[in-house]
Structure formats: structure tokens, C-alpha cells
Curated annotation (Swiss-Prot):
GO biological process, one term: cell redox homeostasis
Gene3D superfamilies per UniProt: Glutaredoxin
Alphabetical list of Pfam families matching this protein: Disulph_isomer (PF06491)
Upper lineage: Bacteria, Bacillati, Bacillota, Clostridia, Eubacteriales
Protein name: Bacilliredoxin STH2395
Organism per entry: Symbiobacterium thermophilum (strain DSM 24528 / JCM 14929 / IAM 14863 / T)
Family: Belongs to the bacilliredoxin family.
Length: 140
């Protein structure tokens, strides 16, 4: 029996976001160097191995980006790049850890979070609208 058929294709999950223009932050150092210093509005996707919610979040990001263009698109992968994910989450301790999720930052400060609880059980269009509204609110 080929057990590889049960292993999620993490690279494909990563590429769903990088193809959209998200920059992968794979280490804590990359996160600390880029996220806090990013000027303007940043959409941070906290990617996830979770098939159900992750399968909603990534298409939602694609739909949202048809309507809004944050200044920066960045992503970390929870469960894969653990140190990078922990470093990102340390920048917004007011929000409990959640993956998949989206954080909207303005000038390096978190101003909104779309946690897993607002992704799971929703359709990609609804989640995309939440992303659009959060980015627009950050723009002022």
C-alpha cells in the first residue's frame, strides 16, 4: 500500500498562495525582518494543513485579491514552518493562535484578524468579503 497517497501535498498548498503573489516567510528571522517594518497594509495568510478550512481560506484569498490590493502579501505555514509562525503570532498576541487565518497589519501593527472560526463552515466568497472589508478598513 502506498502511504504517500495519504500525505497532504504541502508544496501545492504553499503554491496556491505564492502564485497569487504572497511572499513566503519560512524563518523567524524573515518574519522579524519583514512584518514589523512593512509600511502600508499587509495581508498575512497563516496557511494550514487543515484540508477543510485551508481549502476555503486559500481560494478566498484569491477572490479577495480581485477586489483589493494590499501593499504587501506575506504568508507563514502553521505546522510546517513552526518558528516563522510563532514569530508572526508574537506580533499580535491580542489574537489567539488560529490556522488557517488572515491578519491585516497596518505599518507593522495588527489591526484585524480573520480566525479559523470565521473561515470554517463558510464559503470562499464570504471569507473573501471579510478579507476585503478588513483591508479596506485598514486603508481608512
Amino acid at each position: 500500500m502506498d502511504l504517500h497517497m495519504f500525505v497532504p501535498d504541502f508544496q501545492a498548498m504553499r503554491e496556491e498562495l505564492t502564485r497569487l503573489g504572497f511572499e513566503e516567510l519560512r524563518t523567524a528571522e524573515e518574519v522579524q525582518e519583514k512584518l514589523p517594518t512593512a509600511k502600508g497594509v499587509t495581508l498575512l495568510a497563516i496557511n494550514s494543513m487543515c484540508g477543510c478550512a485551508g481549502g476555503i481560506a486559500r481560494p478566498a484569498a484569491a477572490l479577495a485579491l480581485r477586489q483589493v490590493k494590499p501593499d504587501h502579501l506575506m504568508t507563514v505555514f502553521a505546522g510546517q514552518d513552526k518558528e516563522a509562525t510563532a514569530a508572526a503570532r508574537a506580533l499580535f498576541p491580542q489574537y489567539p493562535p488560529s490556522s488557517p487565518s488572515f491578519a491585516v497589519l497596518k505599518d507593522g501593527q495588527a489591526v484585524a484578524m480573520i480566525p479559523r472560526s470565521q473561515i470554517e463552515g463558510s464559503d470562499p466568497q464570504t471569507v473573501a468579503q471579510r478579507i476585503v472589508e478588513a483591508v479596506q478598513a485598514a486603508r481608512g
